[in-house]
C-alpha cells in the first residue's frame, strides 16, 4: 500500500463513529447485492463498492450473437465483492493493456469468460438516506477487442468528487461484433450490451444513491467511439444526459464499417465453418466452444496489420457496423441530418495519439523499418483500407507531412503524426463541429502531458500518448502515489472538470482555468503542466484532409473491410 493512498477495506463492521455499522446491502430489481466499504486516506466518508453486478443474462448458447436479455432474478443476497471476469479476448494482449492503463498500484491477475455482462459500482452516497448523486458510466477502450471494467478503479473519482461511478463491460471481438450483414447476425452486440447496462442504471441506480436523471457516459478510445455511437443512436435516447469521448469518435477510422460480410466469412472459414450462407455460419459458430472461438480470435491476429500479404485480408478490429438498429445510418449521415441525442458533449484528443502504445501493439510502422517518403507511401497504401484513405491521396499527404527530410527518425515521427491526425484528430474535430452545429453545447480539449506511470519503454519524447489522460481522469496519482505535486494537481483538476460536467453539463467551476465552449470561434482547452485556452484545434489539418478526401467517393472506405 502506498503512502499517498492507503486504502482500507472494511470487511468487518466499522468501529469509528459515523461509519456504517454493517456491510452495504442494496436492492436491485433482480435481487439484493452485498458490497464492501473502502476508504481513501484523508476522507471520512467511505465508498460502497459493488463488483460484478449482473446487468444481463450470460450471453451463452442461443444468446451468443443475440441481443442481451435481462438478468434472471435471485432470492438470496448476492455477494458482489470480487472482480468479474473480463469478456473473452486474447489473454496476453488483454493483460498487457490492463497493466499499461490501470490506475491500480498492484497489477491484478485477470480472468476472462464469455459470461461477462457485469458492472462495478462505486458510490459515496449514504445508503441510509435518499441521496441523488450524479452518475458517471465508464465504457472502456481496447479497439472493441480488448479490455474490461476492473482495470479502472472508480474509488478516487467517486471519493474526491462525490459522484457514483459505474464501470461496465460489453462483449468484444467475435462475440461482440460478429455480423453477417442481415437478420441472422446483425452485429453490434457489444453496443447493445452498453444500452442494456444503461437501462439497468435507469432502473436501479437510485438505490445506490445515484440520480437516474443525471447520467454521464464517458469512455476512451473504442470506449469514446462507443459513447459517440450512443450519442448518434436512437436506442440510447433518454438513457444518458451528458457525454464525454476521449480519443475516439464514431468517425474514427477503422472502428465503424458499412459492411463486414468479408470478415464474417473469414471468421467462419478460420473456425472451420462453411461460409455459404449466413444461417449456416451463425449455426456453426454457435456450436463452437469459447476456447475454439478464442483460437479463431488468436489466428485473426487482431490489432496487427499484415504488411506482407494482401492487407485487405488483415483485420485489426471487429468493428461497429451499420446494422439498422443501433445505427440506422452511417455516422456521417446522422451528423449531417442533425438527428441525434444533442446532449452536452466533451470531445478530446491527446497530443500524440499515435505516439507509442498503438504503433507498438500494432507493430505499425514496423520498428525496424527505415522510413523515407517512398517507404511511407508504400506503407500507407497497404493500410489505406483501414485508414479510409483513397490510394491517390497518399502521395500528397506524405509530401505534406514528411517534408522531404532524409532523417528516418524525423520521417517516422511525421508519419506517426499523419496517422494520429487521420484516425483521431480530424474525426474528433468533425464530430465536435457536427454536434455544435446541431445546437448542442460542446467542449474540446487536447491533453499534453507525459504521466510518470508511462512504460519505461516509451520514448521520452512522447508526450500525450493514446490513453495517457486516463491516469488523471481516474486519479492514478492519488491511488498509486510516488508522483509529483504537479501530477496530483493535474489529476484533481481533471476529475473536477469531468465531475462538474457530470453535475451541470459545464466543466467550469471555482478555482479552475476557464474552459471555453466550442462555438464558431472553436475555443478549446490545452490540458497539461500548463493548462490554457487555445483556438481552432487541428483547423489546418481538418482543412487539408477534407479537401484531399473530397476526391474520394462518399463512404467508399466503408463498403468493405
Curated annotation (Swiss-Prot):
InterPro entries: AB_hydrolase_fold, CarbesteraseB, Carboxylesterase_B_AS, Carboxylesterase_B_CS, Type-B_Carboxylest/Lipase. This is Carboxylesterase 1E. It comes from Rattus norvegicus (Rat). The gene is Ces1e. It holds the Pfam family COesterase. One of its GO terms (biological process) is retinoid metabolic process. It is an enzyme of class 3 (hydrolase). One of its GO terms (molecular function) is carboxylic ester hydrolase activity. Residues 1-18 form the signal peptide.
Amino acid at each position: 500500500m502506498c503512502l499517498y493512498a492507503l486504502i482500507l477495506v472494511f470487511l468487518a463492521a466499522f468501529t469509528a463513529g459515523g461509519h456504517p455499522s454493517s456491510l452495504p446491502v442494496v436492492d436491485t430489481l433482480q435481487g439484493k447485492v452485498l458490497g464492501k466499504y473502502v476508504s481513501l486516506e484523508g476522507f471520512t466518508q467511505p465508498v460502497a463498492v459493488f463488483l460484478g453486478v449482473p446487468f444481463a443474462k450470460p450471453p451463452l448458447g442461443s444468446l451468443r450473437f443475440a441481443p442481451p436479455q435481462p438478468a434472471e432474478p435471485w432470492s438470496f443476497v448476492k455477494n458482489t465483492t470480487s472482480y468479474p471476469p473480463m469478456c473473452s479476448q486474447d489473454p496476453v494482449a488483454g493483460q498487457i493493456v490492463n497493466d499499461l492503463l490501470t490506475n491500480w498500484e498492484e497489477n491484478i491477475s485477470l480472468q476472462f469468460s464469455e459470461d461477462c455482462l457485469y458492472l462495478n459500482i462505486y458510490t459515496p452516497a449514504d445508503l441510509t438516506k435518499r441521496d441523488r448523486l450524479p452518475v458517471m458510466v465508464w465504457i472502456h477502450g481496447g479497439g472493441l477487442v480488448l479490455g474490461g471494467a476492473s482495470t479502472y478503479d472508480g474509488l478516487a473519482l467517486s471519493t474526491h468528487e462525490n459522484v457514483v461511478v459505474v464501470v461496465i463491460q460489453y462483449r468484444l471481438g467475435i462475440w461482440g461484433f460478429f455480423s453477417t450483414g442481415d437478420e441472422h447476425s446483425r452485429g453490434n452486440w457489444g453496443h447493445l450490451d452498453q444500452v442494456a447496462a444503461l437501462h439497468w442504471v435507469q432502473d436501479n441506480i437510485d438505490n445506490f444513491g445515484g440520480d437516474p436523471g443525471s447520467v454521464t457516459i464517458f469512455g476512451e478510445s473504442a470506449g469514446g467511439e462507443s459513447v459517440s455511437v450512443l450519442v448518434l443512436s436512437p436506442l440510447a435516447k433518454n438513457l444518458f444526459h451528458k457525454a464525454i469521448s476521449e480519443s475516439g469518435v464514431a468517425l474514427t477510422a477503422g472502428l465503424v464499417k458499412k459492411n463486414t460480410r468479408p470478415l464474417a466469412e473469414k471468421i467462419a472459414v478460420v473456425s472451420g465453418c462453411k461460409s455459404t450462407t449466413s444461417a449456416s455460419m451463425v449455426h456453426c459458430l454457435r456450436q463452437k466452444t469459447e476456447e475454439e472461438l478464442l483460437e479463431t480470435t488468436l489466428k485473426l491476429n487482431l490489432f496487427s496489420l499484415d504488411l506482407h500479404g494482401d492487407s485487405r485480408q488483415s483485420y485489426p478490429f471487429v468493428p461497429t457496423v451499420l446494422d439498422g438498429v443501433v445505427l440506422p445510418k452511417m455516422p456521417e449521415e446522422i451528423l449531417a441530418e442533425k438527428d441525434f441525442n444533442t446532449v452536452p458533449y466533451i470531445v478530446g484528443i491527446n497530443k500524440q495519439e499515435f505516439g507509442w502504445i498503438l504503433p507498438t501493439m500494432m507493430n505499425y510502422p514496423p520498428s525496424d523499418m527505415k522510413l523515407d517518403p517512398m517507404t511511407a507511401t508504400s506503407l500507407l497504401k497497404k493500410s489505406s483500407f483501414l485508414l479510409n484513405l483513397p490510394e491517390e491521396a497518399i502521395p500528397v499527404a506524405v509530401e505534406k507531412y514528411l517534408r522531404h527530410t532524409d532523417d528516418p527518425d524525423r520521417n517516422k515521427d511525421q508519419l506517426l503524426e499523419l496517422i494520429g491526425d487521420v484516425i483521431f484528430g480530424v474525426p474528433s474535430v468533425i464530430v465536435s463541429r457536427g454536434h455544435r452545429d446541431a445546437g448542442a453545447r460542446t467542449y474540446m480539449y487536447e491533453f499534453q502531458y507525459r504521466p510518470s506511470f508511462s512504460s519505461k519503454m516509451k520514448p521520452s519524447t512522447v508526450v500525450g500518448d493514446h490513453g495517457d489522460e486516463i491516469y488523471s481522469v481516474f486519479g492514478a496519482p492519488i491511488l498509486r502515489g510516488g508522483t509529483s505535486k504537479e501530477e496530483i494537481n493535474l489529476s484533481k483538476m481533471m476529475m473536477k472538470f469531468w465531475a462538474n460536467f457530470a453535475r451541470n453539463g459545464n466543466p467550469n467551476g471555482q478555482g479552475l482555468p476557464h474552459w471555453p465552449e466550442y462555438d464558431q470561434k472553436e475555443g478549446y482547452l490545452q490540458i497539461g503542466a500548463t493548462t490554457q485556452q487555445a483556438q481552432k484545434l487541428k483547423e489546418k489539418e481538418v482543412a487539408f484532409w477534407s479537401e484531399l478526401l473530397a476526391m474520394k467517393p462518399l463512404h467508399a472506405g466503408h463498403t468493405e473491410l
